[in-house]
Amino acid sequence: MIISSANDYREAARRRVPPFMFHYADGGSFSERTLERNVTDLADLALRQRVLKDMSQLDTEIELFGEKLAMPAVLAPVGACGMYARRGEVQAAQAAENKGIPFTLSTVSICPIEEVTAAIKRPMWFQLYVLKDRGFMKHVLERAKAAGCSTLVFTVDMPTPGARYRDRHSGMSGDYKEIRRALQAVTHPFWAWDVGIKGKPHTLGNVSAYTGKAVGLDDYVVWLGENFDPSISWKDLEWIRDFWDGPMVIKGILDPEDAKDAVRFGADGIVVSNHGGRQLDGALSSARALPSIADAVKGDIKILADSGIRNGLDIVRMLALGADATMLGRAFVYALGAAGKAGVENMLDIFKKEMHVAMTLTSNQKISDITRDALVDLSKL
């Protein structure tokens, strides 16, 4: 099929990847209203077109936590990327490096930290969940530190798992899931060969290294469910702040008061995020939550935003709402599932070209030029 956008990659991934993995990435929680609003609230923001400005020196580069980024985007942490393409985390990390942006490895990746860092030269970011097993948290932090990971992304919006009903229908969970997955693999032969056979092992590399035994997808669901910690508070994060030498980013902020707490805590950055609509259905979309958070803490802490970004125009919209940079999740997973490393590289090229168009036609020559003036207040029309 012809690929011209991230939406095309979604359709290509739907055809190529078995339903249990496609819907794991594509779905949200409960009735998926927040998942839907993440996309529509962002897309509904009208850009303010300005003309006859010299845009010949347009530049999408930024500096974030001491790193040069070719554009204000970071590949977000996504669990089990190695089930979308053969050793998928390695392929995605290499694509990000080639396009000049960071890659963030999930705690629950297929490829372990050391396998990914050995395949790239650029320091990657590492994401950690709040878990009851502090021994695991310390173990994986030590490994991330030893491997040269530059920035820690601490996800705080999962003290309990969201109700992802679509997973039960797709075969990711629920009755007879093993049989259903096997049948799906038979009907997706390219994936079965490239990922199912040549992409082994399909264990969670970081978790398996700690437990000393292979932890597969089914074990991972149980293990995570048992280890989510609803008692976590800011005080519990202090030892992590003390242990980690580099920048620390708190992911999962939707309220200005929580953003202020992150500043008081001493975090270097926050990610305005509702976990891609996979946790609390009915929560604000990131686009709706971002402006008040930016008003509260802009300049005191770096603000990243994710959830709902499907093209380069959406990146510009997030920046206009107050973000310093963005994180891309589903968009790169679709491209990874459809075409591996080459797909992710092409997707990032598409996003960058779309940013060029949006910046040119809103007359913003540099990323720092983009403010809310780039948006039209439709309520006044």
Swiss-Prot record:
Q: Kindly give the InterPro entries that the UniProt entry links to this protein.
A: Aldolase_TIM, Alpha-hydoxy_acid_DH_FMN, FMN-dep_DH, FMN_HAD, FMN_hydac_DH_AS, LldD
Example of a GO biological process term: lactate metabolic process
Which annotated residues bind FMN?
106, 127, 155, 251, 306-330
- Keyword annotations: Cell inner membrane, Cell membrane, Flavoprotein, FMN, Membrane, Oxidoreductase
List cofactor names only: FMN
Secretion signal, residue range per the UniProt entry: none
Q: Where is the FMN hydroxy acid dehydrogenase domain?
A: 1-380
Q: What is this protein called?
A: L-lactate dehydrogenase
Q: Which organism is it from?
A: Actinobacillus pleuropneumoniae serotype 5b (strain L20)
Q: Which gene encodes it?
A: lldD
